[in-house]
Amino acid sequence: ERLAEILGRKEEEYGHPIYLISDEPYREIVFSGFQAPWIPHLYRDTIVCYSFSKSLSLPGERLGYVLVPGQAADSGEVYAAVAGAGRSLGYVNAPSLFQQVTSLCCDMTADLSVYERNCKLLVPALREMGYHVAEPGGAFYLFPRSLEPDDLAFSERAKQFDLLLVPGSGFGAPGHFRLAYCVQTEMIQRALPKFQALADSYRLSLIHI
C-alpha cells in the first residue's frame, strides 16, 4: 500500500502512467498461512507476469501469462505492445497438447507443503552449523552468506563435498550463495552432513593458519 501511494503521487508529479510489473510465479508458494496480496487491487497501473512452472512443479516449461488489467492506463496500447513483443522477440512455444493439458489443471497446484517442510529442516540446521541464513517466507530458495568473502571460491570448494551451489555474484550479491530446496526431503537430510563437513573444513583451515 505504501508503494502504491508513492507511485500514485509520482504519476501525478510526472504527468504520465508509471507501470508496476508484478512478477508472480511464486505467489502460491508462501508459508505459515500467509496470502500474497493481489497487487492490481492496490495499484491501478499494475502488469502481472505469471508462470505455472512453479505452482504445478513444471521446471523449465514456459507456460504462463501476462495480465494487463482493463483498469490500467492505456491498457489497450500496453496489451498490443506485449502481444507484439511476444511475436517479434522470438521464443519456443510449449507443445500445443501440453498447453491444453495445463489449461485443465491451472487452478490446481502440486503438493507445495514439501517446500515449507524442507525449509524448516534446512534453516535451523544450517544456523547451528554456523551459516548465516535468513528464513524466507516462501518460494524454494535460501540465500545464505558464504563462509568466505569469495563466493565463487566457496561454491567451487563445496563441490568437493558433492554440494552444487550457485554463487551470489550472479545475482548481484557477492559473499552469498543460492541454495534450492525444491527436492525430496530425503535429499535434504542426506545433504546436511555434507554442509557440516564443508563448514568444518573452514574451521580446520583457521586452526592451521
Regions found by a protein language model. Name each.
Residues E1-L206:
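PLP-dependent class I/II
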